[in-house]
Each structure stands twice: as C-alpha cells, then as structure tokens.
C-alpha cells in the first residue's frame, strides 16, 4: 500500500530585530530582539490544493506556536512566503509585512487566536 502526503509544515524558533517588525508587533518591546516562531515551511500537494488543507495546517501550526509561547515568551509567528500567491494566503489570515524585508510576514499572537477560533 502506498501513502502520500497531502501537506506538511515545519516550525522553528528564532528572533527578529526590533526594526524589522511592524510597529504593532514591536510596540512595548524596547530595542530587544523579538522572539518568534518561524513557520519555515507549509506546503500542500498540487492535487490537494483548494480543499482547505493549507488553512488546517496553518491552524495547527498556530496552535503549536501558542503552546511554545506559553513556555518561551514568543511574540509573533514569522514566515517567508515563496511567492506572491503564498503571500496572499498568509495576509488573508492577518500576517503583515515587515517594514524592512518585503518577503517577511509576521502575525502577532494576539491576532493569531482569531485564526484558530
């Protein structure tokens, strides 16, 4: 029996320079680097696209980020979309662009809660 993956994601932790974060995310954080969870990859197979799998994976990634944040003081989730279509996907769910890095999108964890409700 053969199995195939409909999609996957991967997470890691990191930090963002304060000036790279949008004002709404860096507010009240001083000049210290902002702790983030990086959504390093999120992909859905071509045959499974358009079925809500990407949204489900994003919700799962956010839930896991919330668990990490309880222990590590994470402020936001960060991703680097591979292309404009991916960027549009993330911005639909509240990710906002970095003022200094066009291909870097961030989601404040307070806003992320809305995506998983």
Question: What kind of region is each of these model predictions?
Answer:
Residues 50-64, 92:
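Conserved acetyl-CoA-binding loop-helix of GNAT-fold acetyltransferases
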């Amino acid at each position: 029996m053969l199995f195939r993956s409909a999609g996957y994601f991967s997470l890691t932790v990191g930090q963002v320079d304060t000036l790279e974060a949008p004002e709404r995310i860096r507010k009240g954080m001083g000049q210290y680097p902002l702790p983030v969870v990086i959504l390093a990859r999120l992909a859905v197979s071509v045959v499974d696209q358009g079925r809500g799998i990407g949204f489900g994976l994003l919700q799962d990634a956010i839930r896991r980020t919330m668990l990490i944040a309880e222990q590590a003081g994470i402020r936001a989730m960060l991703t680097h979309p591979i292309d404009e279509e991916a960027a549009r996907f993330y911005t639909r769910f509240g990710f906002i662009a970095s003022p200094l890095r066009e291909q870097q999108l961030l989601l404040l964890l307070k806003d992320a809660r809305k995506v998983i409700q």
